[in-house]
Each structure stands twice: as C-alpha cells, then as structure tokens.
C-alpha cells in the first residue's frame, strides 16, 4: 500500500501501473474538502515513485464520484472571498498535478461522475466508462459554476458548443452520448472495465497510443477562429438569456468566463474560472439553490425512513377517471404499479384512458419508449364501471368531483368492496380529511393524497394525515407516491391543507390590489419578471379555473373566517358570475386561443376591464415593491402560521412544498429561505406598513418573536475552517 487516506487509497496494480481507488465510508464517494486534500497527499507519494509507468483511477462504489459534498457548500460559501479563492487555487493545484504526471493516466468510470467527480476525470488522459454512466457538470443548477477546472478542460476537449450545452444547462449525459461527443473514449461492460482500462494504459505506455497528444489541447488556448468563437458564444448567450434570465446569473457567468478564457492556456484560464466562481458562491441565489438541493435530500430521506418497513403497493385503483384520474393512473402504471380506473360512465373512462394514452404517445414521439413499452404500460391500466378486482387492491385514491357529499358516498361504498387492510385516500384539494373520514367504518385506513395538475409534471404530492389516520396508512401512501416518482410531504389536516391554505391568502392579496385600482396585467408582469413566479396571479387563476378558485375560496373562508372571509365582491366573483372560467372555456382575465401546437395562448380582452371596473376603485399605479409586498405578505404569514400550528413539520418541508407544488421561485429557495435572506426584522418592518389592510397582513407572534431576537428559521451555518486547515484536512 503506497498511501491510505479515509476516503481513498493508492497501491500498485501491476508492472509499474498504480491504482488510485476512491473508497469513502458509506455508500457513495463524494469529492469533499478532505478527499481533495487526501488526493493531493496521494499524488505527492506517487510523484516520488521512479518506477511509475501509468495510473488508473477507479471507484470501489456503485458510482465513481457523485459530486462534491454539497452539505459543505453553505459553510464554504460563508468563507471570505480571498480565502475561498485560495482554497480553489489549492484544489486546482491538486488536479493540475494529476494532469501533469509524467505518465499516462486513465479513469475507469462506473455510474455517476458528476460535478467535482466529472472535473476529476477530465484531468486524466483517458476515460473508459460503463453503460450506466451519467457524467456532467450540474453546478449552474446550484447557482454556481464549475470550480475545479471544468469550464477550462471541457471546452478544450469537446469544443465550445458541446461544452457550453453541458455547462450552461447543468446537464449530465449517458454513456452513448458521452462517447459520441468525446467525453469518454470507450464504453465497456462493468465486468471488463478494469481489464479494459489496463489494456488501454499498456497501449499508452508502449507508445501505441499518444497520451501526450491527448493531453496537450487541455493545456492550450481553445482552438476556435474569431468567427467560430463569435457564433458559438453569441448563440450560447442568447439561449441562456432566454432560458435562465436575470434571476439565475450562474449560466451566463459560466458562458462569459469560457469566452474570456478561450484565448488563454490552462493556468490563466483557471484563474478566470476562480474569479468568476467566488462571487457566484456568495450570492443569495447560490445559497437558495443549494438550500433546495439539501431540502430535497432531507424530504426524500424522511420519506425513505418512514417507509423502510413498508412494502410498496403492488396494485392500485383510482376512483373517477377524467383528466386527473387518467393522469394518476398513467403515473402509477408508468412507474410499474398496475392500476384499476373506475368511473360510473363510459365517457369519463374514455377520457381517462385517452389522457393516459396521450401521455404515453408523447413519450413515444420523444423516443423515450418504443411501441412495445407503450403497449405494456397501457395494458396495466384497467378501466371499469364496477368493482371487479378491488378485492386485490392495496391502495385506492378517490379523484371524483370536489363535493363532500359525493366523495363521502363514493368512499363509503368503496370501503365495502376492498380488503380490511386496503388504504383509501382522497385527492381532495380543500375538504378536511376529518370530514370525509366521518363516512368510513375504518378512518384509520384513510388519509388525503393531494396530487397537483398536471400530475405527470408536478413533483409534489401532499399526504394529509387525518386525526384518525394510522402511521401504517400514511407510510403506505408515501411509499406509493415515492414509487410514482413523486416527492411526498406529509402535512396535518386543516382546510386547504398546506399548499392551498397558503395559496389563497396570496390570491386574496391580489383581489385586494385589484379592488384598490391595480391593473392585473401589471401585477402579473411584476410577479413574473421581478419576483420570479412562473405565472402571475391572474394567469394562474385562469389556469386553475376561476370556478375552481371561486369554490375553494368559499371553503377557505368558511375554514378561516377571521382572516379569509371577505366583505366585498372581488374580481374572482365578477369573472365567475360572467361565466369566465379561465382557460377551460377560453375566457378569464385573458382570452385564450389555441396556437399551432394546440396549446392555449393568452390574448388581451378589453371586455374584462369593464367587468372588473364594477369591483374596483379608479385605476392606481402601484410601485413594483408595493405589489410584491401586498402579494407576498399574506402568503408568508400563512406559511409561518402553518409551521407554528404543526400543519407542516419543518421549514425545509414547507419550502419544498412551495417550490414543487406552486412553483415558488427556486432562486428564492422557498418562503423560509426568503425570510431568512431578508431578515425577520426587515420583513416585520415591511409587513407593518400594510397591517391596516386587514388580518391577512398581521404578522404571527412567532415571527414577531424571531424578529425581536434576530433569529433565522434555518439553523445558522458556521463558515468553513480557514483555507490553510482545509489543505491538510
């Protein structure tokens, strides 16, 4: 053994070939600060070996290196800029030493090589991969850019266009694509990976392969003519401006850095990467996006822990076909859980099957599946008008009309047709689970399961624990949602649960703005372009359905009369009374026509202004900041109340529910991350300016207390140790 660290070791393999093996404690390898330091120490030992002829890098895990240790990021990002820059210089000196070894080097890559893992293998001369490879640089999705030489080496290896596509979009690619673009040199089966790697190294050692020529382009300026460079970078910047926008600075910074570094060799190019990385790491956007990644891991880990002793349902059923029922049935079948779809008429069943078939055909058109796979999936969805087969169902989700009487009747009838241990769930969006459970003989086997539309796209499923829901019931439904590829978050029962409970105060803030003379078009523009929502409130209401919102608004007002009961006729009432129900009938705040792809396209409609004039004061031009404050304060206050009341268990789960269920702008990180970034005292000062608008604007006592003590909702993070101690960690 030449060297042994905590996460890697170095040993002779055969005949002058050494192997450097990543083998961290636990199930995966991460390129954390300690591993980078250990890699440097291993290379120091290796550089003294006069008999060295070649080096093989490999992993003892199912994945090569899954990336940097993102749990370290928040503390690293608090390190002063100069120290962070020094740490990056040190880390890059390690990878440069790997790249500069006087012998051929090869990385045998299995499974994932992402982020720092990808940057590590870019420093070797050759890369051999297994068919399960996923390799790429996802850093821009975390609000940063590659910092270990990825933005320098990848363009010089692949050419500007392919590299820009991966780096700016934060993409990873599979083995076949990686081979095609030159990111790996060969793909072999797992069982022959090491044998193949040694064979390639031998060819390089004997001179049959020119490893020096392979290495040289990574050390030089990017080979692009002025015209080629102008085309590549202009197109890339245009694409990034269109897709990422101003709220996500990392992709544009990465493109501009690669452009600026194109005329330099490795050392100066790495300096430019360093100078770009450090300011990005100190942005609120990076902290928010890293926070989302960590929250996502926390939420998924919690679901995994909850279901560790539970068998995933093998047979499911959906009550109520149509768009929603068909979407749920498709998602379950697509992920391998057969589903019975029951309705009371053929028309609805046909609609549900058509929806499932449409979604599968889209997968076929995109080349994701073949006809055989399509037929196999669709054959596991069984439409029926009766309860045949319900005696072997493990879990049933009811997705009928949002009417408590109808839902109770359907659930009570179904309970008599299933096994005693079968779990029943309701896909209600607002009706309290306790109310629906009152119709059942075994309420302990019942809970809420709130999917979001469109089911195949929206990652969140709210799992609602009723007062009598058993732990086993919740675990079974969480297991099914996880199997469907969704992110389940368990909340406690109340009107609207979590997501709709916090959404309707936001809509109430919108209604009050319109009442006070705001133009809905400007409100939409500000909330989309300035705050960053994917849709403004008017557009969102049209998509949700004005009739749906009108009904839900009444349910929420009954549930929380003190805050959500309004004493005036609002814009939603006016549109509802005029039968303007939004996209579903082509008229809402906007008028809708189908575009060439059959999707609804919004257009101005002057008639809506006359309609809204009856429920509004004369036009008043509100500032952008006023609009944002009046829209967001009611939502933030309600989110805080939900945490204080135990409706949602943690700030992390609340923020993920908002991001995954409502599209809360990821660069803000969620309501609690946004609050912590603003500072609770600053938020309180802002909110108090609007408390005259009513109870929705009154800040909860718990938040007032946080402001008094200047406390954040997330645990405070300490800066990482000084860079000097990081080197020898």
Curated annotation (Swiss-Prot):
Which portions of the sequence form the region 3-hydroxyacyl-CoA dehydrogenase?
Answer: 311-729
Q: Where is this site: Important for catalytic activity?
A: 119, 139
Q: Might you give the EC number(s) for this enzyme?
A: 4.2.1.17, 5.1.2.3, 5.3.3.8, 1.1.1.35
Q: Which residues bind substrate?
A: 296, 500, 660
Q: Which InterPro entries match?
A: 3-OHacyl-CoA_DH_CS (IPR006180), 3-OHacyl-CoA_DH_NAD-bd (IPR006176), 3HC_DH_C (IPR006108), 6-PGluconate_DH-like_C_sf (IPR008927), ClpP/crotonase-like_dom_sf (IPR029045), Enoyl-CoA_hyd/isom_CS (IPR018376), Enoyl-CoA_hydra/iso (IPR001753), FA_oxidation_alpha_subunit (IPR050136)
One GO-annotated biological process of the protein: fatty acid beta-oxidation
Active-site residues?
450 (for 3-hydroxyacyl-coa dehydrogenase activity)
For the ligand (NAD(+)), the binding residues are 324, 343, 400-402, 407, 429, 453
One Gene Ontology cellular component term attached to this UniProt record is: fatty acid beta-oxidation multienzyme complex
Q: In which pathway does it act?
A: Lipid metabolism; fatty acid beta-oxidation
UniProt region (Enoyl-CoA hydratase/isomerase), positions on chain: 1-189
Q: Where is the signal peptide?
A: none
Q: Provide the alphabetized UniProt keywords.
A: Fatty acid metabolism, Isomerase, Lipid degradation, Lipid metabolism, Lyase, Multifunctional enzyme, NAD, Oxidoreductase
CDD domains in the record, alphabetically?
crotonase-like (cd06558)
Q: What SUPFAM superfamilies does this protein map onto?
A: 6-phosphogluconate dehydrogenase C-terminal domain-like, ClpP/crotonase, NAD(P)-binding Rossmann-fold domains
Quaternary structure note: Heterotetramer of two alpha chains (FadB) and two beta chains (FadA).
Q: What does this protein do?
A: Involved in the aerobic and anaerobic degradation of long-chain fatty acids via beta-oxidation cycle. Catalyzes the formation of 3-oxoacyl-CoA from enoyl-CoA via L-3-hydroxyacyl-CoA. It can also use D-3-hydroxyacyl-CoA and cis-3-enoyl-CoA as substrate.
The record's section on PANTHER family has: TRIFUNCTIONAL ENZYME SUBUNIT ALPHA (PTHR43612), TRIFUNCTIONAL ENZYME SUBUNIT ALPHA, MITOCHONDRIAL (PTHR43612:SF3)
> What family does the database annotate?
In the N-terminal section; belongs to the enoyl-CoA hydratase/isomerase family.
- Protein name in the entry: Fatty acid oxidation complex subunit alpha
Q: Which organism is it from?
A: Salmonella newport (strain SL254)
């Amino acid at each position: 053994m030449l060297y042994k660290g905590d996460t890697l070791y170095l040993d002779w393999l055969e005949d002058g070939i050494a192997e450097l093996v990543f083998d961290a404690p636990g199930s995966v390898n991460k390129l954390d600060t300690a591993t980078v330091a250990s890699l440097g120490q291993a290379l120091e030992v290796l550089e003294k070996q006069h008999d060295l002829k070649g080096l093989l890098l490999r992993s003892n895990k199912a994945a090569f290196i899954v990336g940097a240790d993102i749990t370290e990021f928040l503390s690293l990002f608090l390190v002063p800029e100069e120290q962070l820059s020094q740490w990056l210089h040190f880390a890059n000196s390690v990878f440069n030493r790997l790249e500069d070894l006087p012998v051929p080097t090869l990385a045998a890559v299995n499974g994932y090589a992402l982020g720092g893992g990808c940057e590590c293998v870019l420093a070797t001369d050759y890369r051999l991969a297994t068919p399960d490879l996923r390799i790429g640089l996802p850093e821009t999705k975390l609000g940063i850019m590659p910092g270990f030489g990825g933005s320098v080496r990848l363009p010089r290896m692949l050419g500007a266009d392919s590299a820009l596509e991966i780096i700016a979009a934060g993409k990873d690619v599979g083995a076949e694509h990686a081979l095609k673009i030159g990111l790996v040199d060969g793909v072999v089966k797992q069982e022959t990976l090491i044998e193949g790697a040694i064979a390639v190294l031998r060819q390089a050692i004997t001179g049959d392969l020119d490893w020096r020529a392979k290495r040289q382009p990574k050390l030089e300026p990017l080979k692009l003519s002025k015209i080629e460079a102008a085309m590549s970078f202009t197109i890339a910047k245009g694409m990034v401006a269109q897709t990422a926008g101003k709220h996500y600075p990392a992709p544009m910074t990465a493109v501009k850095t690669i452009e600026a570094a194109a005329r330099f060799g490795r050392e100066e190019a790495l300096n430019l990467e360093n100078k770009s990385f450090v300011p990005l790491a100190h942005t609120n956007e990076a902290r928010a996006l890293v926070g989302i990644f960590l929250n996502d891991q926390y939420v998924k880990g919690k679901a995994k822990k909850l279901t560790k002793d539970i068998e995933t349902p093998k047979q499911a059923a959906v009550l109520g076909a149509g768009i929603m029922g068909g979407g749920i049935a498709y998602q379950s079948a697509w992920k391998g859980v057969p589903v019975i779809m029951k309705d009371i008429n053929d028309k609805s069943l046909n609609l549900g099957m058509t929806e499932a078939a449409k979604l599968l055909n889209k997968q076929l058109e995109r080349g994701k599946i073949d006809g055989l796979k399509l037929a196999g999936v669709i054959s596991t969805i069984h439409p029926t008008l009766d309860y045949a087969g319900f005696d072997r169902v493990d879990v049933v989700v009811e997705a009928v009309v949002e009417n408590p009487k109808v839902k109770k009747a359907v659930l009570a009838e179904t309970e008599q047709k299933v096994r005693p241990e079968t779990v029943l769930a309701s896909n209600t969006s607002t009706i309290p689970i306790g109310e629906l459970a009152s119709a059942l003989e075994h309420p302990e086997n019942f809970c809420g399961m709130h999917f979001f539309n469109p089911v195949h796209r929206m990652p969140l499923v709210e799992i609602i624990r009723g007062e009598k829901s058993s732990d086993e019931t919740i675990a079974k439904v969480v297991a099914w949602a996880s199997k469907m590829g969704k992110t389940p978050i368990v909340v406690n029962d109340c009107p609207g649960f979590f997501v709709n409970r916090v959404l309707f105060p936001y809509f109430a803030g919108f209604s009050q703005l319109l009442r006070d003379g705001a133009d809905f078009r400007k409100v939409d523009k500000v909330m989309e372009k300035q705050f960053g929502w994917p849709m403004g409130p008017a557009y969102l209401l049209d998509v949700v359905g004005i009739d749906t919102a009108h009904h839900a608004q009444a349910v929420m007002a009954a549930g929380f009369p003190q805050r959500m009961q309004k004493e005036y006729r609002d814009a939603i009432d006016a549109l509802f009374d005029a039968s303007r129900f939004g996209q579903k009938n082509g008229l809402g705040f906007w008028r809708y026509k189908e575009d060439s792809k059959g999707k609804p396209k919004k257009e101005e409609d002057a008639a809506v202004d006359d309609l809204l004039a009856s429920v509004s004061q004369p036009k008043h031009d509100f500032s952008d900041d006023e609009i944002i404050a009046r829209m967001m304060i009611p939502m933030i206050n309600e989110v805080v109340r939900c945490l204080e009341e135990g409706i949602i268990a943690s700030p992390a789960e609340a923020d993920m529910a908002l991001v995954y269920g409502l599209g809360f702008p990821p660069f803000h990180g969620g309501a609690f991350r946004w609050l912590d970034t603003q500072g609770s005292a600053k938020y309180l000062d802002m909110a108090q300016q609007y408390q005259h608008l009513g109870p929705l604007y009154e800040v909860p006592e718990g938040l007032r207390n946080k402001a008094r003590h200047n406390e954040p909702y997330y645990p405070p993070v300490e800066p990482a140790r000084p860079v000097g101690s990081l080197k020898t960690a």
